[in-house]
Amino acid sequence: MLTRAGPLLFAGGFAFLLFVLLAELPFGDPVMAVGRVVLDEAAATVGAANIVTSVVLAYRGIDTMGELAILFAAATAAGLVLGHPGKADQAEEAGGFILRAGADLLFPLLIVVGMYIILHGHLTPGGGFQGGVVLATAFVLPVLARPGQVPSHGALAIVEGLAGAVFIATGAAALAYDHEFLTPLLSPGRLGALVSAGTLPILYLAVGLKVGAELAGLLIRFTEADAESPR
Amino acid sequence: MVWVIGLMMVLMLATAIAALVLDNLIGATVAAASVSLGVSVLFVLLRAPDVALTEAAVGAGLAAFLLALALKRLGLWRIEVQQKEEDGRAD
């Protein structure tokens, strides 16, 4: 009885807290004034047609670097728990016909869609994180279809490390020009052009490759782990 | 617009309940992923396409992938027909 009461009490208290907070706020009336300022300023100063990107990479660039660091730490910890890579020789049999044919068809499509989402991150919705996830699924799908042929973890680690280094180097380059860390360099360019918004596309490409390589490595390690672990 | 929101609410509730109720764990995984798809449609209607894209990629894609791999690792990745066959072989 008492074990049930605890979570119920917590949920009730939490609901009460939310209710009190919401009762004080006028509905649909933003309390923060920052959003309005960003909407007015971002297109002219940063040059990204997608305002979200200008917030994520230009105004809150260090937040994004923190996110990358958190993702890296989580992937490393999961890799440690999941154990040794390799051991492809005892791989299970290949997937069924539908899975194999679907993986062959979807692989190029997913690569193109992922790269499109990453490279147009400063113009259209999406960006490095979303495109990176799409790229990761593109590389894990063939592993599911043919468990024997695994992309090497070394290559994935090199891509991930280079992408992270490019992100930090782009941020550090701003220091050389007496700006703050991760300030967008180069000219904003014409709003809506593919080559615009200064260094933001480079940053998003780095984010996308890093996230993609990281998640692909993690998921592939997950598929390998199930072959060797006892039930 | 309102009826799309209503449809999505019904769909999300139905798939969420299906994820809880279904005995077939593969079906439950798919149902859990389709809740995320409904959420991402709602995000598009609320004019947050960036969040919708993240929800579709991570919530529907990656989370379903992880759930499926976890099922496979636990040895629960099978449909009932196969299960009966394996049980019959064990006898």
Model feature map: region roles:
Chain A
Residues A75-A101, A225-R231:
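Cytoplasmic juxtamembrane regions at transmembrane-helix boundaries
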Residues M1-F16, S152-G164:
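Alpha-helical transmembrane segments and their helix-start/interface "positive-inside/aromatic belt" motifs
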Residues G126-L135:
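Structural signature of hydrophobic alpha-helical transmembrane segments
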